[in-house]
Amino acid sequence: PSTVTLNPGPANGSLLPPYFIPVEWGQRFGLPLSEWIVVPALWIGITVGAIGLVIAWRAVTDGWRPRIHLMFYLGVALNMLTAIVPPLTSADVLMYAAYGRLQRLGMNPYDITPAEIFRQAYDPVLVWTERPWQDTPSVYGPIASWSQWLANVLGGESMHDIVFWLQMMAVIPFIVICTVMIKLAHGDAALQTRSVLFTILNPLLIWAVVAGAHNEALTLVFAIIALWFVRKSPFVTGIFIGLAGAVKVSLVFYGLALVWGYRHDWRKVLQLGIGALIPIGILYGVFAPQALFAASRNTGYVSGGSWAPWMRSALAWVLPDAAHGITAALGWIGLFVIGWMLSRVLPWRAVPGAQLPAERDPLTIAVRTAVILCTAWIVTSPYTLSWYDLIVWAPLALLVPTRLDWLMALRGVALSVAYVTGRTVGFSDVMVNVVAFTIRDVISSGVQWFVLIAIIHWFWTTNRQWPTAAFIRNGFGQLLVTADRPQPKRSPLRPWRRPGVAGPR
């Protein structure tokens, strides 16, 4: 344990991970290392990893086709090794454990905070939580809460063992996501390679999701499985997207993408809706009605490193009382504006296996729309973090290479580096008030503004179309119109490649 490595508590003889050098042993060898060593080392590691990712996907564009199974197994090994050491730089996993502990004690984590308990009496699990979220009730959906309860059941009264089970609940869904993405890209070696590179071999996601033990993969895995069933059964697709929404409400964007994909056939929209309502109605309506409203607590936050601090600070000079509200409103407006712009510039390419043109294939439409909506959300939300990017990286793998790949990598590097000092304990005043402030609130926020400006420039110079009245009328006229019948004969889709570059032989 150090300033960047969580202390999950003593193992007390447990043979389970996470494995680490006990504090008393480390002191004999001069451990933990100074913050001025470990923090820059992580900055360098994250940056080098991102550069490696860019080199790899450029190689794919130039014709590199590695053996997918070897790539996949390498990714599995790297992620499992990452998951057996203590989580790094974020104490969120300790809060997951705390919410599960409250449930084991018979309390409601949506009403009671961990601090309300451990300030009154000693608790072997809650005592290991860290600021600043100890006074915050849960904002997670019922499935996420169930996973937190299950980790407590398996881990008993040991925070160490509970953290291990929560790490497994982060890494296993992450691996499943990659597996499904490879299946979705079947028959196209380039897309399959991108699917591995953009998920379990993506250093930015290994760092943000697995090293931080965040529950983003548990959130997304149901939505990705829903994509697998799009061409098979709208009802089953609805079941899985409903389960995704029961982990985190933010998966509503995937739900909207699926509705948009099926919009030409009202019967499929109806089946999708019925399927989604079953898990949502049961899990939210019967087991955890408060969870649906708890998620709204996140909408009022502003995170360091996003575009919002600059805007809020500027507005505070002239409208101090309204600055926060105006910033939040601009985020919502930006969601629609950036979403529209991305819809005009992202190219169409049918997901492998399509029997209809790309613009009419429900899976292709859903994947492209998910990328558009989720990208628009993460780049315009006043509260945005690097592990949120998983919901964009996964479907982005099925699109042709565009400048959005670069923008996602740039954004991910900035936010990941910014939150190396994300914990609120253990750092010196100079590190927090000077270095961390500069990295997070100056450099990272500047990068987020650059990403927004780059998307606007992309739209302005590529396909500057605005939603005219005729466009809107035509769009409404196409809603719920039965889709074209599959064409009986189509030439097989060929893997994309850069013009003038020979493909694999």
Across the structure, where does each feature detected by a protein language model lie?
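Specific aromatic-rich, kink-prone transmembrane helix
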Residues: V176-V180, T219-P234, C374
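Transmembrane-helix signature of polytopic, membrane-embedded enzymes
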Residues: R65-Y73, M181-L204
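Transmembrane-helix motifs of polytopic, lipid-linked glycan transferases
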Residues: V48-R58, D161-D188, F336-R344
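Loop-to-helix entry region of an early transmembrane alpha helix in multi-pass inner-membrane enzymes
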Residues: P40, P142, W146, G156-V176, ...
